[in-house]
A protein has these predicted regions:
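Residue at a beta-strand N-cap/secondary-structure junction
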Residues: 49, 58, 216, 248, ...
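Alpha-helix-centered segments that form part of catalytic cores
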Residues: 96-125
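An amphipathic alpha-helical interaction segment
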Residues: 113-123, 129-207
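Extended, amphipathic alpha-helical scaffolds
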Residues: 306-307
């Protein structure tokens, strides 16, 4: 698989909330903090404001606007930000639904399609390379998302057998497409493995690392895969990914290690050699540098969150 598919397969984003929200001319809605989630919204009709904690300026959303909110921060959607907001949790519990549409206030001056994705395990490998608000506003971007939006609207408004599963799968497709559009759009401005995928040379090297994480890769081998000299490759990788090739290899190995320990209960003695480490001590030291805790401490902390 390619690196983006690798990361998404590891995190297994699952759309646990997908729906359509409607509002009249005057409304305001407060959405709470949701750490470890990604929210995706597409404005089907009307305009509104988005104000997010930690972001200086509110964003104006218009018909056709699509956005990702990957950091789980609390935010307000509103026709007018001076209005007192309604709590989204209360709306979900008691709000009226008609033809699959949840109403914030009477009327349909505003319609937005939304999906909330839960990530399995630690999502920082993906979330840390994304800004608080990912805006997809230009016409070519909207066109590539249009079919998914229309299909999800159809499933929401006219529920059929199996419709919930279809909506969940289409929502996942929408998320992946939005990430692809973002990395292409922000190639010159973004730094991180996600943006590096838009550069064919860096993508080739990242694919080698993701394809064989246990291999004892050298800088020369990775540079050769990118068709570059060692010096130019090392400089280019650091500039686009934000870290050195060898540091990135370690980060990816430790991400895989954490996932395996959480999901399979494998021991360090079996995981370490499977990820290219000749000794448990070297593996444990690398793991602690990455996660700030020993492998055993990390697993205990993960289990405590599940209970």
């Amino acid at each position: 698989m390619d690196p983006l598919s690798d990361v998404l397969s590891l995190l297994k984003p699952r759309a646990y909330v997908t729906g359509v929200l409607a509002a009249g001319p005057r409304w305001s809605l407060q959405l709470p903090v949701h750490e470890g989630t990604i929210k995706c919204y597409c404005v089907v009709k009307g305009d509104c404001w988005l104000s997010m904690e930690g972001v200086d300026e509110p964003a104006r959303l218009r018909t056709g606007s699509c956005l990702l909110l990957p950091h789980g921060r609390p935010f307000v959607l509103a026709s007018d930000l001076t209005l007192p907001p309604r709590d989204a949790r209360e709306l979900l519990a008691t709000g009226e639904r008609h033809n699959g549409v949840l109403s914030v206030s009477p009327g349909e001056d505003f319609l937005v399609l939304g999906s909330h994705f839960a990530l399995e395990g630690d999502g920082r490998f993906l979330l840390d390379v994304l800004p608080p608000i990912v805006m997809l506003n230009n016409e070519s971007q909207r066109e590539s998302l249009r079919w998914a939006i229309e299909r999800m609207l159809r499933e929401m408004r006219d529920p059929q057998p199996g419709g919930a599963l279809i909506a969940q799968q289409v929502a996942y497709t929408l998320l992946v497409e939005a990430l692809r559009l973002h990395l292409a759009d922000d190639l010159q401005r973004g730094t991180g493995w996600l943006f590096a995928l838009a550069d064919s040379r860096m993508r080739a090297a990242l694919s080698c690392i993701h394809g064989e994480p246990a291999r004892a890769w050298t800088l020369q081998e990775l540079a050769r895969s990118a068709g570059m000299s060692r010096t130019a490759f090392a400089r280019g990788f650091k500039r686009t990914v934000g870290t050195s090739p060898m540091d990135y290899l370690t980060q990816w190995r430790m991400t895989l290690a954490a996932k395996r320990m959480q999901n399979t209960g494998e021991t360090i003695s079996s995981i370490a050699p499977a990820l290219g480490y000749k000794s448990e001590s070297a593996f444990s030291a690398a793991f602690k540098r990455q996660w700030g805790a020993s492998p055993r401490e990390h697993v205990r902390a993960h289990r405590s969150l599940l209970h």
